[in-house]
A protein has these predicted regions:
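Structural and coupling elements of P-loop NTPases
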Residues: 1-244
């Protein structure tokens, strides 16, 4: 069988001195060989996995070959995200996305100093790709992000890591929204009725997300748009094997 694997974890700053990022892959089929060029299904790009490693406590060991069930770590420059698929170009496969818990708390995240904007954007981008917290963008706003979490502790961890790992002090300001809705299929926001009390943001896959003050407002939005299927969490991709 052809090689395939999926990214189940990304960890930034495993070596704090170098701000490295390690993407952990689980091999699903075929044999992985060091230096292999693979297809990244989400971007369509070819990636060369030249420095695969396995980890045992604080020790790292270079991997020459890996087999189904094995876990390897590769250095990532920001191309990969949790749930992404890599495979051989001749036998493309895409695995289903990881399910995401619906956020219940939302806040605006911004740097205290505009002089730290570069570190702020870099830190937010890297931590977002770990999948530990949901980060949303507002159209035309680059000075802040909207973050969504299941519990307050996630906000505190995000703030701590930005300060300690990226040297940027941030403000976390709660906003008065308690639920989010995605839509099934490609439905532009301008086609929806009743967004007066909603905040429209975009997730890491550039899908529109509607933040609402409460469940009643969410229900009212759904009632006004009966031909649209609303989801409480991001829509999952469909696993598929192509070219066979």
């Amino acid at each position: 069988p052809a090689f395939s694997a999926f990214v189940f974890k990304i960890q930034a700053n495993m070596d704090p001195k170098h701000h490295d990022r390690i993407a952990f892959l689980r091999i699903c089929s075929g044999i992985f060989e060091k230096g292999a060029s693979v297809l990244h299904r989400q971007s369509g790009k070819m990636l060369r996995l030249s420095q695969p490693q396995q980890f045992l406590a604080t020790e790292r060991q270079t991997v020459e070959k890996a087999y189904p069930g094995d876990i390897i770590g590769i250095f990532d420059t920001g191309e990969l995200g949790v749930g992404d698929t890599v495979c051989e170009k001749k036998s493309p496969v895409t695995f289903i996305d990881f399910p995401v818990f619906p956020p219940e708390l939302f806040a605006r995240l911004s740097p205290e100093s505009s002089m730290k904007r570069k570190q702020f954007l870099n830190g937010v981008s890297q931590l977002a790709q770990e999948g530990a917290i949901q980060i949303y963008k507002q159209p035309y706003i680059m000075e802040s992000f909207i973050i969504g979490a299941v519990g307050q502790l996630q906000f505190e961890v995000m703030k701590y890591r930005l300060e300690k790992e990226y040297n940027v002090t941030v403000n976390v300001e709660p906003i008065s929204y308690t639920c989010a809705r995605w839509t099934e299929g490609d439905v532009p926001p301008e086609e929806l009725i009743g967004l007066d009390n909603a905040m429209v943001v975009y997730d890491r896959r550039e899908r529109p997300v509607y933040l609402l003050p409460n469940a009643w407002q969410a229900g009212w939005l759904e009632e006004r748009n009966k031909d649209v299927v609303f989801l409480q969490s991001p829509p999952l991709g469909v696993a598929r094997l192509e070219g066979n």
